[in-house]
């Protein structure tokens, strides 16, 4: 069974918005279950949302202690007024917990922007 999630990429220059997740005890990219661009537009109160790419990959689920198949959709939200904590990808990867649990997502994003 695929686990579908949308990842929102909100940039200021070379930094990306992340939020601290109390459950995971680490910073994460804004995300939501499912793949509905209209929900993303409503959440951020903007029509400036664009689909970038998608990735299907297997990943170990720490919370369920087993391998799962994930289908991630990546969207860019263009709105410089969104407040929060912004990091470079390198800054995020300096955190061992982020590196262990989210390096795949960060590498997908890095790969996308390096090809642009």
What are these regions (language model features)?
Residues 24-25, 81-116:
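Nudix hydrolase/Nudix homology domain
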Residues 25-30, 59-63, 76, 115-116:
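Functional cleft and adjacent loop/helix regions within the main domain
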Residues 9-10, 74-78, 88:
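Short, well-ordered beta-strand micro-motif
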Residues 1-7:
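Acidic, metal-coordinating catalytic segment for phosphate/diphosphate chemistry
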Residues 19, 52, 87:
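Hydrophobic residues at beta-strand termini and immediately following loops
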Residues 6, 12-47:
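Conserved Nudix-box catalytic region and its N-terminal flanking loop in Nudix hydrolases
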Residues 41, 45-81:
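Active-site segment of metal-dependent pyrophosphate-handling enzymes
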Residues 3, 29, 68-72:
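Short connector loops at helix/strand junctions that flank enzyme active sites
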């Amino acid at each position: 069974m695929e686990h579908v999630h949308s990842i929102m990429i909100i940039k200021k220059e070379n930094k990306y918005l992340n939020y601290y997740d109390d459950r995971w005890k680490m910073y994460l990219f804004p995300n939501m279950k499912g793949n509905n661009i209209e929900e993303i537009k409503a959440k951020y109160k903007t029509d400036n949302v664009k689909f970038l790419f998608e990735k299907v990959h297997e990943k170990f689920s720490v919370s369920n202690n087993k391998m799962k198949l994930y289908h991630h959709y990546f969207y860019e939200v263009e709105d410089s007024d969104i407040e929060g904590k912004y990091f470079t990808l390198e800054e995020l990867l300096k955190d061992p917990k982020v590196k262990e649990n989210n390096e795949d997502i960060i590498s997908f994003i890095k790969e996308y922007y390096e090809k642009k």
